[in-house]
Amino acid sequence: CEALKDLCGDGIAECVRHIVGVQFRNQATIGGSIYGRFGFSDVLTAFLALDTFVELYDGGTIRLSEFVNRKPDKDILLSIIVRKSKRKFRYDSIRQTKTDFPVIACSVVTGMVHGKETWYFSVGARPMKAALLEKQWEIPADASEEMIADYARQAASEFTYGSNMRGSAEYRQHLAEVLIRREMTSILAEGR
């Protein structure tokens, strides 16, 4: 979708690129991925960081971060609402093989919210469903690598991680820190 590409760059394309196999990827939908609230969902991780809203038939319009934490029900997802605002968006994931589920998936978004610079961090495949962290950090554009690494460490440490056959909780936290640092560095290098 050109509107999403204009708003988010190549981040959304990156989050759907790894969906297992061409046949499945051509049938998968953004709505189905978000409604399912799957722990391995790249799409949920990306849209959660974009401060997205969902419109439900019975539940009305609520933030995606609230919807993710609701118990599964029989409500119908009508639409997904992404705010159109000037923000920088990055998404990345680590996989053991190209078409495997992610070991960890991270998304970082920054922009002005109510006059304050706000950073949104979403980490999925922890192996729990994606979670969102919001920070009002004013990071200088010329921030040093050490300063960015400290911010990334702090953000990654505020998520809960678990272990399964793809990796331990400690391994996932380390990977999340690395991905968050890379994404923050990329955003700061591009300029806001």
Regions found by a protein language model. Name each.
Residues 1-192:
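C-terminal structural segment of proteins
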